[in-house]
């Protein structure tokens, strides 16, 4: 039996995720420019056909000062994508985090007017859409706007404070003017959980009824191996969002070996039990993705290998995590074999 499993896994080393799922959905990875070389480059070329700049397109990185853009890292990612017949997901225009303070201040250092902030947002969106229209197939227009710590529907942010609740609608309308054929997405975390699903549905339904040009919703999918309700919650969320006529992207998938509340720091590598549970969760959620392939058109992993993941040091400083399909050496984990085998 062991020989059969080993031989089967060796055979699967020749398989490509992107090619295996070509009749289902795009397979993407979040990347930095450093990922375009070495073992990560090899993994990208073999397994992925969609790239998301992990941080390079976020407002504070690409537009740190009013009269200065920083296109260097995205240029490298774009060049790599075009050369290798890949597409980009643009991430993100409007977010309460990683937006430089100048966006919300006037020339005197006072709070900017609604009109000035909208004007700046328009210029920012126009510049990025026109620069990347040949390679971006979807934009995360607004990110994480739904409140999840109180009973309020919308999160407090400088965007909302200055522009008002219509800032989401305005952002999508501006993006629609300049984004060409690219699809426009609202992106959020935990939006498959019942408490946030209900709120998100209300927000999106109201926006759509008012003619807001939203094409789809991004389910970030920062999950862990211990959630027993994940599959049932995910199916319900997909059906609810699809009922609004929305396309669905899985935008930031990783599966932590720790519960969010788990503060342990004693592990220097994942246990065999953790890796088996992780493989099973990946297997289960990809089965759901395939089941709903009519509405799910892209699945993106938030990273390439466990060598580099945003889950390191979060939510516990100094702790390593192992949430992706390839280990710290870039070798396939059992989770990869499980989602190739169907």
UniProtKB/Swiss-Prot annotation:
InterPro entries: GH10, GH10_AS, GH10_dom, Glycoside_hydrolase_SF. GO terms for molecular function: endo-1,4-beta-xylanase activity. One of its GO terms (biological process) is xylan catabolic process. It catalyses: Endohydrolysis of (1->4)-beta-D-xylosidic linkages in xylans. It is an enzyme of class 3 (hydrolase). PROSITE patterns: GH10_1, GH10_2. Its EC number is 3.2.1.8. Keywords: Carbohydrate metabolism, Cytoplasm, Glycosidase, Hydrolase, Polysaccharide degradation, Xylan degradation. This is Endo-1,4-beta-xylanase A. Coiled coil: none annotated. It is found in: Cytoplasm. The gene is xynA. It comes from the Bacteria.
């Amino acid at each position: 039996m062991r020989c059969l499993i080993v031989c089967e896994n060796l055979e699967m080393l020749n398989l490509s995720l992107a090619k295996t799922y070509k009749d289902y959905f795009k397979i993407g990875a979040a990347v930095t420019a450093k990922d375009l070389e070495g073992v990560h480059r090899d993994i990208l070329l073999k397994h992925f056909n969609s790239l998301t700049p992990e941080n390079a397109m976020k407002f504070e990185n690409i537009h740190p000062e009013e009269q200065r853009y920083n296109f260097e890292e995205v240029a490298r990612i774009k060049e790599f994508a075009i050369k290798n017949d890949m597409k980009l997901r643009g991430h993100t225009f409007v977010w309460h985090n990683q937006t430089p303070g100048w966006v919300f201040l006037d020339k005197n250092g006072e709070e900017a007017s609604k009109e000035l902030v909208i004007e700046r947002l328009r210029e920012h969106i126009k510049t990025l859409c026109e620069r990347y229209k040949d390679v971006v197939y979807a934009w995360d227009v607004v990110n994480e706007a739904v409140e999840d710590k109180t009973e309020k529907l919308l999160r407090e942010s400088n965007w909302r404070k200055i522009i008002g609740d219509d800032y989401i609608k305005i952002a999508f309308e501006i993006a629609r003017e300049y984004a060409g054929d690219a699809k426009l997405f609202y992106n959020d975390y935990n939006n498959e959980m019942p408490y946030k699903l209900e709120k998100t549905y209300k927000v999106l339904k109201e926006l759509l009824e008012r003619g807001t040009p939203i094409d789809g919703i991004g389910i970030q999918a920062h999950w862990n191996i211990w959630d027993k309700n994940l599959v049932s919650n995910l199916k319900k969320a997909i059906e609810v969002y699809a009922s609004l006529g929305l396309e669905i992207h899985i935008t930031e998938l990783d599966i932590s070996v720790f519960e969010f509340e788990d503060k342990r720091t004693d592990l220097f590598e994942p246990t065999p039990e953790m890796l088996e549970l992780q493989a099973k969760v990946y297997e289960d959620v990809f089965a759901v993705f395939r089941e709903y392939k009519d509405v799910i058109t892209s699945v993106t992993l938030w990273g390439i290998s466990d060598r580099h993941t945003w889950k390191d040091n979060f939510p516990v400083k100094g702790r390593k995590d192992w949430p992706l399909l390839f280990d710290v050496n870039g070798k396939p984990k059992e989770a990869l074999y499980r989602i190739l085998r169907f």
